[in-house]
Amino acid sequence: MKLSYTEIFKHSDILNPISATSLLSAGKLAQLEPKSTILDLGSGKAFPSLLWANTFGATVEGFDINRDYVEYANSRAKMLNLSNRVKYSCKDIRKLRLDKKYDVVAFLGLGMTQVYGKNSDVLKIFESLLNKDGILILAEPVWLVKPVSSEGLKALGEAETSFLTEAEMRHLMGESGFQVLRHYVSSKEDWELYVRPVYIAMQEIMKSKSQLADEAQKIINGFKAEYAAVGQHWNMLLWVAKMH
């Protein structure tokens, strides 16, 4: 039996190591306002897009494959009195077909190649969903240097092709028709706030469901490896880029 993302991130609001401060700064840079429309792809528990909707008055449409997360996100929207302009739906974003465009597309930390495949193809998908001069807000892990050591790849359970370096990412965006306005680098504290709730959730599993203790410990070890690799092999960057 495998633990679900719902169980792993039971106590987590945001499912990646990005601070609310960075998200608010990104929203300001994107010039979010009440008439802005946001598409949140892989919305998770929707902390970022709910923050933008609540702060800037934007309208949000989000999609995630996890039904528990979608129900949670919609309940949060209702609690914040945002249901009239914020809605989340349960769909596989890889199969999503939309016939409209948005002012902002957000894709936060899912991993472009893991979800869509080739990086350049992913950016074309985002471009097709944006209005003229639209903004892409993208969170993506980056390698600090290449080649990545075999020890680092093994510890993270990743291939070197999983992610780009910062320079490669910036170059790819430029080639794909995006002008990078700014990027925000996750701090060690951001990562601590990301991994700590997972440790708590897994420790609860280990105490209450002994048959899942080994699986829970593996998950803890995986998150510890991610945290240890920050500043050594990789980090998370939040990009704000304008289509041109």
Question: Predicted regions: what is each one?
Answer:
Residues 182-244:
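Conserved Class I S-adenosyl-L-methionine
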Residues 48-94:
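Class I SAM-dependent methyltransferase SAM/SAH-binding core
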Residues 16-34:
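Conserved alpha-helix/loop element of class I SAM-dependent methyltransferases that forms part
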Residues 97-105:
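A short acidic, Gly/Pro-enriched loop at the edge of an enzyme's catalytic core
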Residues 120-135:
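A short glycine-rich, Lys/Arg-flanked "PGG" loop and its adjoining helix->strand segment in the class I
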